[in-house]
Each structure stands twice: as structure tokens, then as C-alpha cells.
Amino acid sequence: MNLYYYFELIADERRIRGLFLAKSASASEWKAVSAAIKTLVEEATFDATNEGLTFRAMDPSHVALVDLLWPSVAFESYQCEKPFKFSVRVEDFIKLVGRSDAKDSVEISSTEEDAISVKFTNGYKREFVIHLIETSAGSAPLPKLEFDTKAILTKTIFERVLNDISAVSDQVTLAAQNGTLAFSGKSDMGKAAVALDKTGAELLDLEVKAESKATYNVDYLTSIVRAAGQAADTLTCEFSSKKPVKLEFRLNKQGCRLGFFLAPRVSSE
């Protein structure tokens, strides 16, 4: 038996014994996902099946929810012959993912129940092992909602609008009617208002089934847009009057999707 054949047998044996393996061409999706999760929770439990990777959790105050769907076909390489859950401290996971360079491929795998391996490769190969944690947190149910308004806009303009509104208020009111998507905020200091329509380059599409108006916390929205926006240039915003808002980010062209739900603020008017 030559050495090459021997090493191939070892590699095949490891692949067979492996509980889970997911390889992506870059770390941008992992950075966006982990940063988005960090805005809501300190611990995260990922569910891996042969269909892909999912994560869903609600913040402690139960006003916001993040929902990740990362199908197996969206990875460069993916293996999961039986369901596998792994729980990590989000801050620790971010530290490791943050060690990657822009052109690194990322491989996350596990051959044992209590740890995962994180590998970065781009000529310079690095491997980190992070021990898994035990957590009692379960997966949050996904809200079943139908929305009256759906807008597709650039991440840049949405973040800019939120920053403008936050200059005078910690709440932003979204209103849609007659082909216009409006944002406003007010406080004892004063008022701020921004209006977008499809004549501009920033609002890519707007569908309004019925006039919609609802108010949300600016900080929650800003945090998730900054986090997920690391890997997404555009976002979909859906809402209805006095109902939660849903933001959806497509993190790659193969179907990796990050959703975010935020409950409305109760108006004092």
C-alpha cells in the first residue's frame, strides 16, 4: 500500500464518521449570520439536516425573532447524514469567524458530539476547535403572517433612513400608499421624515395591497441591517398596519436567507 492510498483511506474514514460538514467559498455569510444572531441572543443552537442548516430564536423580551435558512445546495460542500444540533456562545463563535480573511474558504465540521472544527483555507491553512455548550433554549415558532406591503430596497438607503430618523427619535413609523414608502419619527426634540418612490434608484420595488402604517424600534432595525448587510446589498421589507415587520436578506445567490421579525410599538396617539 503506498502512502497516497493510505492517506486517502484515512480521509474517507473521517468523512464517513463525520457528523457534519459545511464548506463555503467565503466567510461573509457566516460573519453576517453570527453578527445578526448576536443582536438578539448570547447562545445559538443550529440545526443541521441533510437538507441544510437552520436557526431560529427570539430575543429575551420576545419582541424580535431571527430566522436562518441555509440550504445544503448553497454550500460549496455539505454533508449531514443524520440530524445534528450544535450550540455555541455567539461571542466565541464570532471571535473565530472573525479570524478569517476576505478570500478564505470556510469549513465547519464535527466528528464528535461536543465540539466543532472551524477551518480557513487560502494557501494559509488554519483550524480552530470550539467546544459546544448545553442549552435549554428551544426553537421559536415562526409567525404566520400575511403582509399588505412589500418593498425591496438597497441596504444602504434603508440604513441611511434609519440613521436620519434616529437623529430625533427612537421609533420609526413606516407608511405605504400610492406608490410611496414613507418613514417618519418624532420626539420632544422635533420631527424627521423621508419618502421613497420607484422613480429613485434606492427603492427597487413596491407592492401595496392596502395602505399600511406601523411603528417600530429604530435600534433593533439598525442593528440587524448593519449585521446582515455585511453579505447583502438589498433587503425585502414587509409590513401591515399594527403588525410585525419582516426584513429578509438574501446572503448569496444559492438561497441562503436570513429573516428578521420585529413587533410593532404601541402608538400613544
Regions inferred by a protein language model and the residue ranges of each:
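DNA polymerase sliding clamps and clamp-related checkpoint/processivity subunits
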Residues: 2-38, 43-167, 175-269
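Polyanion-binding surfaces on beta-sheet-dominated domains and ring/shell assemblies
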Residues: 172
